[in-house]
Amino acid sequence: MSKTFRIAAIAGDGIGKEVLPEGLRVLEQAAKKWQLDLSIEVLDWAHCDYYLEHGQMMPDDWFEQLKGFDAIYFGAVGWPDKVPDHISLWGSLLKFRRDFDQYVNIRPVRLFPGVPCPLAGRKPGDIDFVVIRENTEGEYSSVGGKMFEGTEHEFVLQESVFTRRGVDRILKFAFELAQTRPRKRLTAATKSNGISISMPYWDERTALMAAQYPDITWDKQHIDILCARFVLQPDRFDVVVASNLFGDILSDLGPACAGTIGIAPSANLDPERRFPSLFEPVHGSAPDIYGKNIANPIAMIWSGALMLDFLGNGDERYRAAHDGILQAIERVIAEGPITPDLGGKGSTQDVGRAIVAML
């Protein structure tokens, strides 16, 4: 008897409330078509209105509520006019990533037919790579402090944290992913010519890990020139692995090079499956367009496809569902309807319904 996967669906803020229903609509259709065993529960917290009412982003027992799920399907968080971003993010999304040890962040980058590319002369097939970001340590630590506030001697100190365990496990994941891809190529982002302690350590661990994967062609590139090459030579990349900060930058730049962040998905994984993994669009909550019904749901839907592939863990039904959703997305982008960010006039629901119809 096959396992029933439990999914917690959390809309969050802003357009998360608009795109999540379309993602759920597609998941329900995929479950029917490919006989998937999914149990979805919608939870109404981890958003700024909840904070305004309760003084915190999530209930005290959030960990206990969520730990029994297999995945979290998340919209977006943040509404800075209501709650400062550092409160909303550290009180929800970053808690999920760290407390559930979702140390791998995966962000695929692909240029689809029908999406206008801002890079001259690029066509579908030229841009198809994956950014692997370390998701739990690195530059985004809470280690630091502020002293002598209000005086001319005021200073702040923010520390980065790179552990051998943390660095090695993200590098291992990236090299193993590269082994599954036809090009078998990996690029490691660094800045060891300017950051004199943590980045040389990152380089050292990368070289040691690479020695275990002799079939992988790899190189390291400093983050500044790497960003330039994303724009100038995106076709040279296959798997790109980076620290938390550098991965954050690259995984927004990549989709922008492919035309729009509006269709970019991400996965926050605990590869060992001890805790639920989280799947979300790269785009934020976009309060400025909330309520206009023009948010592109494709990133949410594509994130759902990533979730099915991860949950299936080799099950052909779940892989077929992932591939089928991606094919439907490609057709809708090429044939319409599409939302204004892609140059169309379709609504959020128009796009969601069209993808369901394609399935």
Describe the function of each predicted region.
Residues 51, 230-335:
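Glycine-rich phosphate/nucleotide-binding loop
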Residues 35-59, 230:
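N-terminal beta-loop-helix "entrance" segment that forms/cooperates
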Residues 8-25, 29-31, 151-224, 236:
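Glycine-rich phosphate/diphosphate-binding loop of Rossmann-like nucleotide-binding domains
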Residues 136, 142-188, 192-195, 315-320, ...:
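Glycine-rich phosphate/pyrophosphate-binding loop and the adjoining helix
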Residues 23, 27, 206, 300-308, ...:
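Buried hydrophobic packing segments
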